[in-house]
């Protein structure tokens, strides 16, 4: 009995392990795994269906086919277990050992493992320092390779052709040793002395100077060191023994009709065994060399195909012309082991059905069809039936359930009570795609869903299906209830706003209920309270929209927690008073006292959550929904064709537009405008006409004239159904109404260009055939786009999740003082995002001071909640330094303070929260709403791009930042610096507007000047770039020789002559080295010095500059000396939407990036080459100058002799994030990526919190390149995980050694995912073969730190509720004791025993 118990325990035992290591398998290791050699290619006997002996399914090697029964049937039953039958040699045991027992094949000739040969860079090639071509020629028996040169002049590893080999044989006899095939490569690898080779390479590395050579050497050193450290031997990359997969993993299944379905692997193994046996026979017979060679080559190819079919040459195909699936194909790709079976599995206790509305459900409930519930909860029902004694055995209980006896339904009710189920709608784009509900049993076959959770699921009721899952264990039920219940997920994790918001009918009902009407029935009544309002409405004395006075009692919560009553008479409507009855105590009446649209309702719920907490909000949301539905039904809103009122002005607007178009057409025919201009103008005209029609229509729809009580006419907001739906935000938008009742407007061709004939009709009038045909383009493109978009968005989400999956909150506070400075996002004249929204829920990194004083307003390490944000706003704080995950100092993971508030819960984030995955979901989920197209800018948009002045909108004070300027003759400021910013500050010191001011702009007002709204502050010419003098004096030309460096041009109309500097290419040979410039001299002819320096004022003129002064002309500071014409950038395509977001996260370099100054210093231009000019920046302190070649066609923003700071823009263009990181640092690149990504989402009206994007940026910055290695064991130029560098440097500092220096790297998300420390995670993402090959050679250990690795090995993840378990394990590991094995109680043991005996007795009771 005792050993039976022990046996039972052994069956259920799981291995406890802390890490997984991958390495090369030595031949001895493969033999030790194996249970016997497979010698024959046969599978099973087709008559008896028994496996053939020594074949691929042999029972001797792999174990019995039936449980506890040997093959010949001599031993059966449990009592013989462990016996090996003497007749058929099969061990009597469970048949499941056929899933784990391996076999092996002894290869007659060694073969190379194709992964280490062909996976680039070729590991064998790198190790031997031989080109892949040569190695292949040796392996596939085309050439010889010298293994030992002996005393001859032949080098080791030299390749010999057949002829050369024969010649060498004649010359040297057996002095040397040359071989071909895998034996040769194996011998070379065996003879390598890794340590010595390493030493040699290190010496070479010291001596060499060339960059490419260094790179090559470092690569080899790294590989050799990996071999030495991991204990792998190079010759193990050549196989002499081939392992055979257990047979149940490559099954052979009989189909009806005597045929068999088999796994492709069996075919591949058969080929190997056949060729191997043939080769053995040929070797025994001592066959001619050429035949043996051919057979060896075929064996090599067979092994290649088995390991990775199609990697080399043509893929081996099966009988149906389809390539066979090799071992490598089994694990990679979407259908491979990782993604199909380890990361996502199908689960038991689940079902799916169509969803319908459940408007009467509470928020935490869902309707579950009885049929489904009965099936899903079967085990619980059986248990209950047995417990109650209603059924004696499980079998009897089964029968009762199948007969659906009355008592079963009662039991089902009991079982289901308080047992949450999880509902999931595919695609699950964020964590709110799976939520838990309490089931309510319903008749019918459709699941009923609460309408308010539809927004989170993105579900509608047009045939969507949802899946139900049952959490079985107590822990799972607890987690479902405490964490996943729909009532706990009121706020969206992406932006912290309510996601349980009413939409459509509910919004329309509430909007209708809270609207007011002039002269409604019962207007002017005075009521005692909401109760009376409802009474008179129900009695029909007053209507819903009547304006009345009502006595309202508000409850205000004080800071100390007590609530104060406050009663007064309010002007409101009957409907609003009725609605007030369901509003929870503690909210102000002003929330309800307005026409409630969707935004207002959302705000109301948000306020409720922040003020009163979760429970009242949930109840309130439900009440809102019931009320909304009720009054939507009352309102009887419907859409009729008469509701689409066409404006009377439409015809005349269209006639005007057509007249304008005709005029342009005439101009075009008489040659006054070009074809392009005509096209652009026509489109502009029609776009404007469309706007005018739309405006007329909306004015017409949105108000109506009524007679009030005094008999006068008054305008009030319209009660037109279509208008109400759009205005409340229930359905439809102004743009859609415009198509119904205005004009449809311009349409686009499939290629994205706009067709110039607009559709002047609308849907109410109806389209004619041509108009309909033009419309079809757009409609089809829309559908095609959507399909593409979904796939692209899904892939972006997958990459984001993969890069961020292992980021978890691991400690409370890392104590860093670093952070990022937050300011409001201001573009031109509008505040796009106020400071409040950016810092809400963040933690301050340093004390926030009251502006203009030294008083501390907010202490360091304060979580900024709504109250603190109010304080900041009252004191008009303009910038706050907050903690950020990018600057967090935690080694693995981040700390709670750097992350701030958990957006979905509204308090500081908990330890163990998987913030990486949340961030990835929040960014990826709205991906499908982004556009796919690149915007071609033409027509209206391109002309707006050339701005020439700044006009402010508000009144306030001007502030100029990093500005240099001179005052010109007329007393105006002229800007002479490159990146000047103009900010408009209001009287509280808050920035309201911000603009970039270009070089050469003339400012009407200076720094600190007061200004009124609407004033123009700065002017400039957008088409030329001026050269401006900073001093007074006289102009003196240098190196300006007519015909050599300049030419004179006279304007025919004005007769003015101007000088044009020739481009280097146009100059004669004499003028090539001359540098035309303007010097400024005083009256005595001495150089004038630039103010504050000892440099003479001289301005070098680049090619194509126009000078309109004569030599010796008198000038004053601020005058324009010369102008450089700027080509106005033509129509550039702006990448927008999803592709732009992907580009940013992949950190792709733009096509023509902006050129930034690498160091600070003085600009000069060196010798030019044919197509490029040489830019030299000389530092002021006289250290080495920096040179860079820049293509001639790039327009430069700097002149010779100007001073630039590191990171300044030298030539405009899109900035490359890598340059920003290198020259301006981590904060700048974070700010750049966050702002650029936010711009794309903001355009679509999607709100995402900045910190999610910062989380991804942190992951993109997780590698650094070592600049100098100090006393560490890292190599220079090696790319290492940033956390490892930090830990190593801390260690070095403690030991008093030299620390290493490093440069942070920015990796794109795909690269960063593949470069993670965990090979399991990387392999399950992309390029499985390459990742596994690299990991095996390096003998990598996976510490299983991330989420993905733990999911794959089937453990609790180190996040959320699994975080504690992992902490506990880590603690035990430090104390050096394993957690105690779970104790088995006596009851469990006897139950298990009964089960086992049943199995042993063959008692199948089905």
Curated annotation (Swiss-Prot):
Q: Which Gene3D superfamilies match?
A: 1.10.132.30, 1.10.150.390, 1.10.1790.20, 1.10.40.90, 2.40.40.20, 2.40.50.100, RNA polymerase II, clamp domain (4.10.860.120), RNA polymerase Rpb1, domain 3 (1.10.274.100)
InterPro entries this protein is in? DNA-dir_RpoC_beta_prime, DNA-dir_RpoC_beta_prime_bact, RNA_pol_asu, RNA_pol_N, RNA_pol_Rpb1_1, RNA_pol_Rpb1_3, RNA_pol_Rpb1_3_sf, RNA_pol_Rpb1_4
Reaction(s) catalysed (UniProt annotation): RNA(n) + a ribonucleoside 5'-triphosphate = RNA(n+1) + diphosphate
Give the record's keywords alphabetically.
DNA-directed RNA polymerase, Magnesium, Metal-binding, Nucleotidyltransferase, Transcription, Transferase, Zinc
Gene Ontology BP term (one): DNA-templated transcription
Cofactor(s) recorded for this entry are: Mg(2+); Zn(2+)
Sites where the protein binds Zn(2+) 1: 70, 72, 85, 88
Which residues does Zn(2+) 2 bind?
Answer: 814, 888, 895, 898
Q: Where does Mg(2+) bind?
A: 460, 462, 464
Query: Which molecular function term from Gene Ontology is one that the record holds?
Result: DNA-directed RNA polymerase activity
Q: Name one GO cellular component term.
A: DNA-directed RNA polymerase complex
Q: How is its cofactor bound, per UniProt? A: Binds 1 Mg(2+) ion per subunit.
- Name the Enzyme Commission number(s) assigned to this protein: 2.7.7.6
Q: Which domain of life is it from?
A: Bacteria
Cite the NCBIfam families for this sequence: rpoC_TIGR
Q: How does it assemble?
A: The RNAP catalytic core consists of 2 alpha, 1 beta, 1 beta' and 1 omega subunit. When a sigma factor is associated with the core the holoenzyme is formed, which can initiate transcription.
Family note? Belongs to the RNA polymerase beta' chain family.
Biological role stated in the UniProt entry: DNA-dependent RNA polymerase catalyzes the transcription of DNA into RNA using the four ribonucleoside triphosphates as substrates.
Under PANTHER family, the record lists: DNA-DIRECTED RNA POLYMERASE (PTHR19376), DNA-DIRECTED RNA POLYMERASE SUBUNIT BETA (PTHR19376:SF54)
**Record's protein name:** DNA-directed RNA polymerase subunit beta'
User: What organism is the protein native to?
Assistant: Sodalis glossinidius (strain morsitans)
